[in-house]
Structures are given as C-alpha cells and as structure tokens.
Amino acid sequence: MEVTADQPRWVSHHHPAVLNGQHPDTHHPGLGHSYMEAQYPLTEEVDVLFNIDGQGNHVPSYYGNSVRATVQRYPPTHHGSQVCRPPLLHGSLPWLDGGKALSSHHTASPWNLSPFSKTSIHHGSPGPLSVYPPASSSSLAAGHSSPHLFTFPPTPPKDVSPDPSLSTPGSAGSARQDEKECLKYQVQLPDSMKLETSHSRGSMTTLGGASSSAHHPITTYPPYVPEYSSGLFPPSSLLGGSPTGFGCKSRPKARSSTEGRECVNCGATSTPLWRRDGTGHYLCNACGLYHKMNGQNRPLIKPKRRLSAARRAGTSCANCQTTTTTLWRRNANGDPVCNACGLYYKLHNINRPLTMKKEGIQTRNRKMSSKSKKCKKVHDALEDFPKSSSFNPAALSRHMSSLSHISPFSHSSHMLTTPTPMHPPSGLSFGPHHPSSMVTAMG
C-alpha cells in the first residue's frame, strides 16, 4: 500500500501492551529506523483500538478501567517499523486477509490462536501494509515467562490430539512456568499400575530446547499415552510379581482341601468326585451315583459272578448229555439243553439225533458287514501304497482308481489327474511380442 498525503500521521509500529508485542529487538533485525512520537496518549490509543468495531463506530468499553490500568504499567518504548494509521480506521479501508508473514521464525500453529488476531498489524519493513491471518498473527503474543496483558488459552479440539512437533517447550525455565498454566492430562490406571510421566515431560523439554520460547504461548500437552520406554512397563515391584515382570509366579501346590474325607458308605478316602447324600454326609463318586439312581445305599458285598454257561456246574444237555456249550437253552418241558440241540428242535420241532453229536464245538466265521469290508480294504490298500517303487502320476491315478469303489466319494478317481508340465514347450515364448506376431501365432 503506497503512502500518500491523505494519511497524515505516522506512529510507532506497536506498543508492548497493545499488541502483546513484547519481543526484543533481536526478533526484527535490520529494522532500525527513525520514528516519530505518537500523537495520542497511550491510554487513548488503547481506547481507539479496542473500542471500535469493524465499521469504525465506537462501542462501549468491554474491559473497563482495568485495561487502562494494566496498560499504564508499561512504558511506551517505541521500536519497530513505521506504519500509517488511518484516522479512526474508517470502514473504507477493507481488511486485508491475504497478508503473509515476512519473518519465518513465527510458526503457524493451531494451538496459538488469539481472540484479537484481527487487529494485530506487523511489518517486516516499511512499505506494504498487511494484516496477519489469525494463525500467523497470533504468534506475536507468544508465551513469555512474564505476565501477559490478555492471556486466553484456547480450548483444545476434542477430536484432535496435540502435535508435539508443532508446540514444544523452549527451555526448562519456561516449561516449568507454563506447566502451571496449561491443562494436565493423566492416564487413569489402577493403583497397582500407576506410571510416572515425569520422565516423558523431561524428554519433551530437552527435545524442544533448540526452538525459541517466544513463539508458543501454550506448552505441549502431556501425551495421552507415555512413550515406549521403561515407564510403560513398570518394574516388577509395582506388580508384586517375579523379577521377570509379567511372568507367572510359580505358587506352591496348595494342600488339597479334600484330605481327611471318607465315604460314609464304603469308607473310600480317594475318589474323582465327592458327593453328598440326603443328610449331607460325604459319599464317593460310585456310592453317590448309586444312591442318586436307585434311592438307596450302594451294597458293600459284591454279588457273586454267575458262572459262564459253558462251565455251569452240574448242568448237562437233556438230549445229548453234553456238559459244554456256548449257550444253554431250554426245551418245551423246561429241561436244559445245549445250544445245538435247542436250535435243532426250534427249527425242526424234533429232537436232534444223537448221531450228529460232536465232541468239539464247531465254530464258524461270522459274515462281515459291508462297513467292515470297506474299512479292511482301505486299510490294505493304504498298506500297499508305500510299497510302490515308482511314484509317477500315471501309476498314482491307476492306484486311486482302484480305490474309487471303496471310498465313499465316487469322484475320487478324478481328483488326481496327470499334472501339466511345469516348463512350457520350447515353441512358446513369453517375451514382448509385436501385435502382428501374436496374430500370426493365434492363426
């Protein structure tokens, strides 16, 4: 913007209290110019800047006398470049939102927003007038250790986690001062798993030691989860475990609480499962199940085993007088007969002739079921499979076809076919061909 005669007054660039510009002269090197004294008192300038709306109309003072009292505490030291201030900032001068920051050390950060970013005016050199965008102009009110005139820490967004690379503390002194003002986020853990986050804060302070503390009004929020270091896995003393930390602690085998129990029915002292009867007394598993199923105590005396039918003492066939048989039967009169005589009478309704009597018991192989036959044939076929010396696809397919009538899957003979060769014929090449050659090959 060219300076014309219509703009009569030149004032200093900014006052420390008005624009929060408490920057030392080193922030703007090479800006030593001759300045004119301000033609308004300091308090009047504050009223002019903060009591005028966007159209240049006066509005009631929002901050009252406290702002003036605060402003008067700072001496009017003049430094910076010259700016042309129009009379009372009339509405004819539009807001310039496209200005760029001329000094590269002011970092634009989403955490450095100021509620008065529209009125901050900054120049790197006398000449063009530019108004900073909110993200750039807010860095003028950077976090100094001295108290600020207007310090309204912005509310951090709830969905976005803070970026440690954009906002890091400058030095140990400013970090300690700003830690008292910023919000503290803590990871809520059980009492036995409390983690110390002081080491992470110290590492973040050391990390940001090279950057200037004058560009960040709010320090880094503590990380929501500590860094992957020894703090994430606390020592074993916090967990009360073995020296390996999370290792399982071998505990001595607890003494069985079932020692001293005894079954009130049979007197057993060991059982897979202790049960109780209706009165609450302990029963072993066998006695308890018997009592549950039959409603009475399990008999202690085992019944005598019945002698096998073949060796039943004193029993003889009423027809052939034999004493050995696989099964004793009875005839129509109720007399015991051997298995052979009883079946013969059942089939022919006459007694078996004595001429058919044999000393030995004739036995025969029972007819195997179809399922047993299939299982046996599959087993024999699998035993013969490793004996085949040549393992070629043709022999394998023939062998599997021989098993097709045994396997429940009728299509097993088609499961293994002659495999395709791994290497293509020499006549085929997979290199890049010209389209004409491909047409020739297809034809």
From Swiss-Prot:
Region named Flexible linker: 288-316
Span(s) of short sequence motif YxKxHxxxRP: 344-353
Effect of H348A: Dramatically decreased Th2 cell differentiation
Protein name per its UniProtKB record: Trans-acting T-cell-specific transcription factor GATA-3
UniProt main location, coarse: nucleus
Species: Mus musculus
Cross-referenced PANTHER family: TRANS-ACTING T-CELL-SPECIFIC TRANSCRIPTION FACTOR GATA-3, TRANSCRIPTION FACTOR GATA FAMILY MEMBER
Pfam family, one: GATA
Induction: Up-regulated during macrophage differentiation in response to IL33.
Consequence recorded when altering K346A: Moderately decreased Th2 cell differentiation
